[in-house]
Curated annotation (Swiss-Prot):
Cellular localization per UniProt: Cell inner membrane
Species for this entry: Cellvibrio japonicus (strain Ueda107) (Pseudomonas fluorescens subsp. cellulosa)
Keyword match Transmembrane helix: no
GO cellular component: plasma membrane
Cited InterPro entries: Membr_insert_effic_factor_YidD (IPR002696)
Annotated disulfide bonds: none
Protein name (record): Putative membrane protein insertion efficiency factor
Keywords recorded for this protein, A-Z: Cell inner membrane, Cell membrane, Membrane
Main location, first listed in the record: membrane
Family to which the UniProt record says this protein belongs: Belongs to the UPF0161 family.
Purpose: Could be involved in insertion of integral membrane proteins into the membrane.
Amino acid sequence: MVWAGVKLLHGYRYLLSPWIGNQCRFYPSCSHYAEEALKTHGFLAGIYLTARRLIKCHPWHPGGIDPVPEHEATCCSHTHPTHGKH
């Protein structure tokens, strides 16, 4: 499923995006964010993260840098005395 989602994103990026123009207010662009989210978190979580990102895509949101969150398995697992585990 991830492979199919990534192929659809590539199709959008190379066929439709040039006609629409670069209008993304975020870095990385929404299509790159979606690809990374799918590859990092799998199909369902990647779709969820992408949907959350697309919901923020409107004129009243300032945009900016919005990286894909790290997968829990790659986040550190030690406990901090004041903040607990993260």
